[in-house]
């Protein structure tokens, strides 16, 4: 197989009834630490909730380039951002604080590092109680930084 080629297995997809990948659909970001879903509220507050029916947990991930994503709340229209203190907040407009480096880890969870603060290794993270973990308090290996993208519907 040449570099860059993609092979699809239509027969396997039909046989096992696997869903086709669609990155345009909203996702839920489920945090391994405490079982919370990342949420962006209308006032710009970012936290976690276990309530799967909360409309503010539906997030639209869009790629700026390979491995770089914007995370936007579909209900609020606000972008997830990290300020110079490492605090997460919702921004009305996309800016350099809203760009995150998405990485698929060996355990199949994703991590999101602030691109602006990439040299500091500041991750998006949630504490066990659902509150945000400041960037400087996060580091590789913590459960707080592990997120599993899930489909919105429970089907």
From Swiss-Prot:
One of its GO terms (cellular component) is extracellular matrix. Keywords: Acetylation, Angiogenesis, Cytoplasm, Developmental protein, Differentiation, Growth factor, Heparin-binding, Mitogen, Nucleus, Phosphoprotein, Secreted. Heparin binds at residue 33. It holds the Pfam family FGF. The keyword Transmembrane does not apply. It comes from the Eukaryota. Its main location: secreted. GO terms for biological process: activation of protein kinase B activity; angiogenesis; branch elongation involved in ureteric bud branching; cellular response to heat; epithelial cell proliferation; fibroblast growth factor receptor signaling pathway; lung development; mesonephric epithelium development. It is found in: Secreted; Cytoplasm; Cytoplasm, Cell cortex; Cytoplasm, Cytosol. In the nucleus, phosphorylated by PKC/PRKCD. Residues 2-15 form a propeptide. Belongs to the heparin-binding growth factors family. This is Fibroblast growth factor 1. The lineage of its organism: Eukaryota, Metazoa, Chordata, Craniata, Vertebrata.
């Amino acid at each position: 197989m040449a570099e860059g080629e993609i092979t699809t297995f239509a027969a396997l997809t039909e046989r096992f009834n696997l869903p086709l990948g669609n990155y345009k659909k909203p996702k839920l970001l489920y945090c391994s630490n405490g079982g919370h879903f990342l949420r962006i509220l209308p006032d710009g507050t970012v936290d976690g909730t276990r309530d799967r029916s909360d409309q503010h947990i539906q997030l639209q991930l869009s790629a700026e380039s390979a491995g770089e994503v914007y995370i936007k709340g579909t209900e609020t229209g606000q972008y997830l951002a990290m300020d110079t203190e490492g605090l997460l907040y919702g921004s009305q407009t996309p800016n350099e604080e809203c760009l995150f480096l998405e990485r698929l880890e060996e355990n199949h969870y994703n991590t999101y590092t602030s691109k602006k603060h990439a040299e500091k290794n500041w991750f998006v993270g949630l504490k066990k109680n659902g509150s945000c973990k400041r960037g400087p308090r996060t580091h590789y290996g913590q459960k707080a930084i592990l997120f599993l993208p899930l489909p919105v519907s429970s089907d």
